[in-house]
């Protein structure tokens, strides 16, 4: 018998039965518990979990509990047909079938065309890959069904244009960092190789000037610059040198680019196929299954496998498409971080130098700031990322150092060693895994009261009670108290010093600098 308790939402009066779910991993159970607690106060919640950590399984478990003991309807909305099919399969494994009528899984395109034909009102609307939810088709759901509870699931709550999600979602729940998931064995470690900063390839990418409607690089210009035989030959040489005999995914800039890559790889003995939006759904499914069975070594795609592709035995990911979008970068590399029994680590081959503008996948991200629209999910200045110490000192062979095209940025052994030692500053992380200070101390904002608190990872260490958090250094924060005075507190909120009113406090090389 699973222990259960009843939540009564103060805000809505809706009764929700919550049960401990034994089939979930510990972090999924933690996220589920936190979600139901947030639903006591808020109607609309966004949940962030890294790619490969089981968002769809968590989604299914949440929906099953939401339906427990009550006559309720749940709509699950995705932005692509493939995601709909994947979610339907997972939901069915949790004992909920579409024939029952209580759960409907659909694409946003289908729902927009057929909303008038839908029976009844949904009690819960779940948005998969919720970073797309700012589109008007999704906003219509909020307007049409204001009383329905909302849940958004995403690995990347950020937008290239810096638009926040607070118009739709009341609060954000963040999971562990990628560093902690790797340290605890839930995500795969990785090796990371990249083109060199002064390479011809990097100079070509730096020459891209045109932008598309979404603010990212223009596809037409990327194709003209990068879809050349010399460039495709370099892509192949990178795979031959660093991922020979492995199964992998390649991200291309265009349909023509993908087909040229697949043809060149196949011609040179690496069985590859190109998949894009023009590939019929039935054929696409067969090709993916052939890849799972090992009959195809490489899938070259254009925007198809950035989200929702679930194949844990992907052994390498090749980035052949430049992007200014943090979400695209993390979604793509995340395809290789899923764990499988036979995979020691994943090889990430960065042929477009993305780590220089986004950092490594293990870098700490301020999801709260991006969720609120205070920070864009875009590329940072290259000089800032290069000087941020995003690699560690590894003992490399002379052959590696002489590598003509690529340099080794990180090895999986160096990464695991850094995580074990808690030496995460060099990785852009926040602190030792598994300890009290495993992630950086950060400010957290309560939009209802307007006050600020402190959190370490997922744990709120100081409830919102400050008018401002000026600066943070290690386990100390410079704050403005509710009475207007300023001071320094530790990570538990204990005042270390209090000063008279001033305009700003900040830390400078460990010392406090007061600006009046």
Feature-to-residue mapping (PLM):
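Residue-level detector of conserved, function-critical positions
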Residues: 416-516
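Conserved segment of the helicase C-terminal RecA-like domain
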Residues: 336-362
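Conserved interdomain linker/interface between the two RecA-like ATPase lobes of SF2 helicase motors
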Residues: 176-249
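Conserved pre-motif I regulatory segment
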Residues: 14-45
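Conserved helicase ATPase core of P-loop NTP-dependent helicases/translocases
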Residues: 271-274, 279-301
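A short beta-strand element within the Helicase C-terminal
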Residues: 307-322, 346-349
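Conserved SF2 helicase motif VI
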Residues: 325-341
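Post-DEXD/H (motif II) to motif III coupling segment of the RecA-like Helicase ATP-binding lobe
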Residues: 135-190
């Amino acid at each position: 018998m699973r222990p259960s308790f009843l939540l009564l939402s103060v805000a809505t009066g809706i009764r929700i039965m919550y049960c401990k779910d034994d089939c979930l991993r510990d972090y999924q159970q933690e996220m589920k518990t936190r979600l139901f607690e947030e639903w006591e106060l808020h109607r609309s919640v966004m949940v962030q979990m890294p790619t490969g950590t089981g968002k769809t399984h968590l989604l299914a478990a949440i929906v099953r509990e939401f339906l427990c003991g009550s006559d309720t309807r749940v709509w699950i909305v995705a932005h692509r047909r493939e995601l709909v099919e994947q979610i339907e399969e997972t939901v069915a494994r949790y004992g909920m079938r579409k024939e029952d009528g209580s759960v409907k899984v659909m694409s946003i395109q289908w729902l927009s065309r057929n909303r008038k034909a839908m029976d009844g009102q949904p009690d819960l609307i779940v948005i998969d890959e919720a970073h797309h939810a700012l589109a008007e088709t999704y906003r219509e759901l909020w307007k049409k069904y204001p009383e329905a509870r909302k849940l958004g699931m995403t690995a990347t709550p950020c937008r290239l244009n810096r638009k926040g999600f607070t118009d739709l979602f009341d609060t954000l729940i963040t999971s562990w960092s990628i560093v902690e998931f790797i340290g605890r064995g839930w995500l795969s470690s990785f090796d990371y190789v990249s083109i060199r900063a002064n390479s011809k390839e990097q100079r070509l990418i730096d020459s891209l000037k045109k932008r598309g409607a979404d603010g990212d690089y223009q596809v037409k210009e990327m194709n003209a610059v990068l879809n050349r035989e010399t460039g495709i030959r370099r892509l192949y040489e990178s795979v031959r040198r660093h991922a020979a005999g492995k199964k992998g995914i390649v991200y291309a800039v265009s349909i023509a680019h993908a087909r040229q890559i697949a043809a060149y790889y196949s011609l040179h003995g690496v069985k590859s196929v190109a998949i894009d939006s023009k590939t019929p759904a039935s054929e696409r499914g067969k090709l993916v299954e052939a890849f799972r069975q090992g009959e195809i070594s490489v899938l070259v795609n254009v925007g198809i496998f950035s989200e929702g592709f679930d194949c844990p035995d992907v052994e390498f990911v090749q980035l052949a498409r430049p992007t200014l979008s943090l979400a695209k970068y993390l979604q793509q590399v995340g395809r290789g971080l899923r764990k499988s029994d036979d995979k020691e680590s994943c090889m990430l081959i960065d042929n477009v130098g993305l780590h220089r503008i986004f950092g490594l996948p293990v870098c700490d991200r301020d999801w709260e700031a991006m969720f609120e629209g205070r920070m864009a999910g875009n590329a940072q200045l290259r000089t800032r990322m290069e000087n941020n110490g995003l690699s560690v000192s590894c003992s490399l062979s002379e052959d590696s150092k002489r590598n003509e095209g690529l340099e080794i940025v990180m090895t999986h052994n160096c990464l695991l060693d850094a995580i074990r030692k808690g030496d995460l500053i060099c990785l852009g992380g926040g602190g030792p895994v598994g300890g009290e200070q495993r992630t950086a101390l950060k400010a957290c904002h309560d939009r209802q009261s307007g006050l600020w608190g402190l959190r370490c990872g997922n744990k709120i260490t100081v409830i919102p009670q400050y008018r401002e958090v000026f600066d943070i250094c290690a386990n100390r924060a410079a704050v403005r108290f509710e009475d207007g005075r300023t001071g320094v507190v530790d990570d538990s909120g204990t005042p270390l010093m209090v000063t008279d009113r001033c305009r700003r406090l900040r830390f400078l090389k460990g010392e406090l600098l007061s600006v009046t």
